[in-house]
Amino acid sequence: MNVFTLGLRITGTANETDGVVDVIAESLPASDRRVPTKVQLKQKKDHYVGKLLQSLEADATCLAIGPTKPTLDGVLVMQPMLIVTKENFDDLLAINLFMATGGLGPKSDEIELDDTTVTNRSLAWQNDDKETSWFKLSAFGELSKQLAELAPGTPTIAVGKVSSSTKDEKTYLNYTVDRVLYLPKSTRSTPKKAADTEKGQVTTAALGSIDFSL
């Protein structure tokens, strides 16, 4: 998963196809000595960012943040999670984005809701001091199915938003996933007891063997 932060100048008006807003921009700064990078911004029209894209006019400048992929034509295609302009600069101060890496914890079943499904599953990471941090991820829809089916210990990068909730006078952190990337296992030898499927646990030794060099 590639999340880019780019300063852009809009070069054309927004187009809409099949419910998706499409805007062409170029990287800043642009000059005669430098070939600007062409960036295609795409987002659903009913999404908050999609509505903002529709209002952008040619020659407007903005800051765009979101998952990005290159094309064979030398264009970057971004699905922006945040667009910041001079008019909505306060949105940058209110940015809510987490990126967590680690190994998936014990399997968890999908829960059926009225119009979708949700899976709540832990993600664990161990630092150099052998301290393990656990993040309880919540994924909906197609991401829910993926999160429910993968084996414990699967190397994972999760991107989304963090929020808080309270129950019985206790505060909980919630990590709602927008994007998930599952990585291939490291070529390093993983301990035989890295994942105890019978007990549904992931050992910290397994987490330490995961290579997240991208």
Predicted regions and their residues:
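Acidic, gly/ser/pro-rich intrinsically disordered tails
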Residues: 1-42, 46-52, 85-99, 108-117, ...
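Flexible glycine-rich surface loops and low-complexity tracts that mediate binding to linear polymers
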Residues: 58-74, 154-167
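Surface-exposed, glycine-biased beta-strand/turn segments
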Residues: 68, 74, 92-103
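Short, compact, well-ordered microdomains
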Residues: 75-81, 173
